[in-house]
Amino acid sequence: MVELSSVISKFYNDYVQNTPKKLKLVDIYLGYILLTGIIQFVYCCLVGTFPFNSFLSGFISTVSCFVLAVCLRLQANPQNKSVFAGISPERGFADFIFAHVILHLVVMNFIG
């Protein structure tokens, strides 16, 4: 158990010292989206899915926003510059915003 706490402590200290502020902000957004998805799932289990289209739209939107944010984090990470050589962080953010607009238009259309 002591080894686990030392591993967690080392991970946290490395994260705080070595992670850029931009990535920390994306991580906070990812945590918020994850919490929103968990709340929607618990609500579905406790109360039900009526109206089903609204629940499905909300849950699909949450999962899709999480996936888009992970893609943004991968593109904005300075350690991944060799993988995304032709894409600047600004271009990655613009792609993220464009994909969010399209996603929310589709979700609003699905709700009816």
UniProtKB/Swiss-Prot annotation:
<keyword id="KW-0053">Apoptosis</keyword>
<dbReference type="GO" id="GO:0006915">
    <property type="term" value="P:apoptotic process"/>
</dbReference>
<feature type="topological domain" description="Cytoplasmic">
    <location>
        <begin position="73"/>
        <end position="91"/>
    </location>
</feature>
<comment type="function">
    <text>Subunit of the oligosaccharyl transferase (OST) complex that catalyzes the initial transfer of a defined glycan (Glc(3)Man(9)GlcNAc(2) in eukaryotes) from the lipid carrier dolichol-pyrophosphate to an asparagine residue within an Asn-X-Ser/Thr consensus motif in nascent polypeptide chains, the first step in protein N-glycosylation. N-glycosylation occurs cotranslationally and the complex associates with the Sec61 complex at the channel-forming translocon complex that mediates protein translocation across the endoplasmic reticulum (ER). All subunits are required for a maximal enzyme activity.</text>
</comment>
<dbReference type="Pfam" id="PF02109">
    <property type="entry name" value="DAD"/>
</dbReference>
<dbReference type="InterPro" id="IPR003038">
    <property type="entry name" value="DAD/Ost2"/>
</dbReference>
<feature type="transmembrane region" description="Helical">
    <location>
        <begin position="52"/>
        <end position="72"/>
    </location>
</feature>
<keyword id="KW-0812">Transmembrane</keyword>
<dbReference type="GO" id="GO:0006487">
    <property type="term" value="P:protein N-linked glycosylation"/>
</dbReference>
<keyword id="KW-1133">Transmembrane helix</keyword>
<feature type="topological domain" description="Lumenal">
    <location>
        <begin position="49"/>
        <end position="51"/>
    </location>
</feature>
<feature type="transmembrane region" description="Helical">
    <location>
        <begin position="28"/>
        <end position="48"/>
    </location>
</feature>
<comment type="subunit">
    <text>Component of the oligosaccharyltransferase (OST) complex.</text>
</comment>
<keyword id="KW-0472">Membrane</keyword>
<feature type="transmembrane region" description="Helical">
    <location>
        <begin position="92"/>
        <end position="112"/>
    </location>
</feature>
<comment type="pathway">
    <text>Protein modification; protein glycosylation.</text>
</comment>
<protein>
    <recommendedName>
        <fullName>Dolichyl-diphosphooligosaccharide--protein glycosyltransferase subunit DAD1</fullName>
    </recommendedName>
</protein>
<dbReference type="GO" id="GO:0008250">
    <property type="term" value="C:oligosaccharyltransferase complex"/>
</dbReference>
<comment type="similarity">
    <text>Belongs to the DAD/OST2 family.</text>
</comment>
<dbReference type="GO" id="GO:0005789">
    <property type="term" value="C:endoplasmic reticulum membrane"/>
</dbReference>
<feature type="topological domain" description="Cytoplasmic">
    <location>
        <begin position="1"/>
        <end position="27"/>
    </location>
</feature>
<keyword id="KW-0256">Endoplasmic reticulum</keyword>
<dbReference type="GO" id="GO:0012505">
    <property type="term" value="C:endomembrane system"/>
</dbReference>
